[in-house]
């Protein structure tokens, strides 16, 4: 496609596609800067790119938020141009043989909580927290985690009046089944607590390699989702976090103790993991597991190589600083062509649900993928036409408790479904919850496989060549 976007962004090769449209590498012909260009047909039944671009504009300036370069209509396409980013955490998780060390998880947790907190301070929920939606930067930003994919984002309060959205039930499950909170499975309107609970599942996924509700078998997709929900509700926090530091139990207990409109104490959650990090004797040197795999000599000076990977070192006397300088020199020698081939932009790892059964069958075949991808207004957005029947559940209240440590509610609500201990309380008289759940791709399906079809070399390997570290 020989096209110049907005008069200055020239399209390069295609690096991804899906129900949302197509993704291309691009270059600013005026500055030579590489960018990511996302195209969506103007004829699509449920356009979402305009909505997503508005969220990008509202979130601009935040650490770990890609810059929106341009949005508009070009020919038959809605077009959004943003920063080009590196591999997703799911890609790096796979690169590290599907298990991350405690040190790496704790370094990630600090940034991940910050990203979610920033989005909440701007008045929006993410509602699809998963490894695919967090990407590492490139070059000097290679240690920075970026949050992407705001297609399911929803405004949860008015920034002027601070009025919180009302508590509701019987909501369709929105997000990705594997990481969705218990209350989301039960059909409760999502709020800040649900983004944080989902983040907790992501951390346990990294530490343990899988979650207890993965790999469940069922005759239909609806039955599969019901089994995921039942398993998640029935799994005590202590079992979920077995053989892991107690701080993770505390994290989940806190998230599940929050009432619907409570403001979480993000500082408390970050402090939990920071204190654990210090107690373990780790150094916050940004030497992640994938860094040690790529540059084993760095692990010898990170002060924690024995806890991360037991790699042999090529030069035990090499300092981390010297390694970083060497790594930057290597990255500096990359040609523009290799950088284009190696970098994978944020949105190529999205697996959004579509509005029709035809689109879903083409882009989603797995049960753990995103379940809804229709852009809402400030209220609820249109849902999928997918119908798998209804699953009735009763709302489950927890016992009464004092105010959360996070501070006052935006408007006190007594509605909570999960007890602070992670168990399930007595069944209430609330209406049953009906969940119509879309089909989706496995979150672990990496978009790198799509990009690899367009190039002879492994794009993840080239993307990792670009990762440079900085203390």
Curated annotation (Swiss-Prot):
Lineage start: Eukaryota, Viridiplantae, Streptophyta, Embryophyta, Tracheophyta
Q: What is this protein called?
A: Casein kinase 1-like protein 9
Organism in which the protein naturally occurs: Arabidopsis thaliana (Mouse-ear cress)
Instruction: Cite the record's Polar residues compositional bias ranges.
Output: 431-449
Report which reactions are catalysed by this protein: L-seryl-[protein] + ATP = O-phospho-L-seryl-[protein] + ADP + H(+); L-threonyl-[protein] + ATP = O-phospho-L-threonyl-[protein] + ADP + H(+)
User: What are the positions of the active site?
Assistant: 128
Q: Which UniProt keywords apply?
A: ATP-binding, Cytoplasm, Kinase, Nucleotide-binding, Nucleus, Serine/threonine-protein kinase, Transferase
For region Disordered, the annotated ranges are 300-471
From which residue to which does the signal peptide run? Answer: none
Q: Organism's domain of life?
A: Eukaryota
Please list the GO terms describing molecular function.
ATP binding; protein serine kinase activity; protein serine/threonine kinase activity; protein serine/threonine/tyrosine kinase activity
């Amino acid at each position: 496609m020989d096209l110049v976007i907005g008069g200055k962004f020239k399209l390069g090769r295609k690096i991804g596609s899906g129900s949302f449209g197509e993704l291309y590498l691009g270059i600013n012909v005026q500055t030579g800067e590489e960018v990511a260009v996302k195209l969506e047909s103007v004829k699509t039944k449920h356009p979402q790119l305009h909505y997503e671009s508005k969220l990008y504009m509202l979130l601009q300036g935040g650490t770990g938020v890609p810059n929106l370069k341009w949005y508009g209509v070009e020919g038959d396409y809605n077009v959004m141009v943003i920063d080009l980013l590196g591999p997703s955490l799911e890609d790096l998780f796979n690169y590290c043989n599907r298990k991350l060390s405690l040190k790496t998880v704790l370094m990630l947790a600090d940034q991940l909580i910050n990203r979610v907190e920033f989005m909440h301070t701007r008045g929006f929920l993410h509602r699809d927290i998963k490894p695919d939606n967090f990407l590492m930067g490139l070059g000097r930003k290679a240690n920075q985690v970026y949050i992407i994919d705001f297609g399911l984002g929803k405004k949860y309060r008015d920034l002027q009046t601070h009025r919180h959205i009302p508590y509701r039930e019987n909501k369709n499950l929105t997000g990705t089944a594997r990481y969705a909170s218990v209350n989301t499975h039960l059909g409760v309107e999502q709020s800040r607590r649900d983004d944080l609970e989902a983040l907790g599942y992501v951390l346990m996924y990294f530490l343990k390699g899988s979650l207890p509700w993965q790999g469940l078998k069922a005759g239909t997709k609806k039955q599969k989702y019901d089994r995921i929900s039942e398993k998640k509700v029935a799994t005590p926090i202590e079992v979920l976090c077995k053989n892991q530091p107690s701080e993770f139990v505390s994290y989940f207990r806190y998230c599940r103790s929050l009432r619907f409109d409570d403001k979480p104490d993000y500082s408390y959650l970050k402090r939990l993991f920071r204190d654990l990090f210090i107690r373990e004797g780790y150094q916050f040197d940004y030497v992640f597991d994938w860094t040690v795999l790529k540059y084993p000599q760095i692990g010898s000076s990170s002060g924690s190589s024995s806890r991360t990977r037991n790699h042999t070192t090529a030069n035990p006397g090499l300092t981390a600083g010297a390694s970083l300088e060497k790594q930057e020199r290597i990255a500096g020698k990359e040609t523009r062509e290799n950088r284009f081939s190696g970098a994978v932009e944020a949105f190529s790892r999205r697996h959004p649900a579509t509005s029709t059964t035809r689109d879903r069958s083409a882009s989603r075949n797995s049960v753990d993928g995103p379940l809804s991808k229709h852009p809402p207004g400030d209220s609820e957005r249109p849902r999928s036409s997918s119908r798998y029947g209804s699953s009735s559940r009763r709302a489950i209240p927890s016992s009464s408790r004092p105010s959360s440590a996070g501070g006052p509610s935006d408007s006190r609500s007594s509605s909570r479904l999960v007890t602070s201990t992670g168990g399930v309380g007595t069944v209430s008289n609330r209406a049953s919850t009906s969940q119509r759940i879309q089909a989706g791709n496995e979150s672990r399906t990496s978009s790198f496989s799509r990009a690899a079809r367009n190039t002879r070399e492994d794009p993840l390997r080239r993307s990792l060549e670009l990762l440079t570290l900085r203390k």
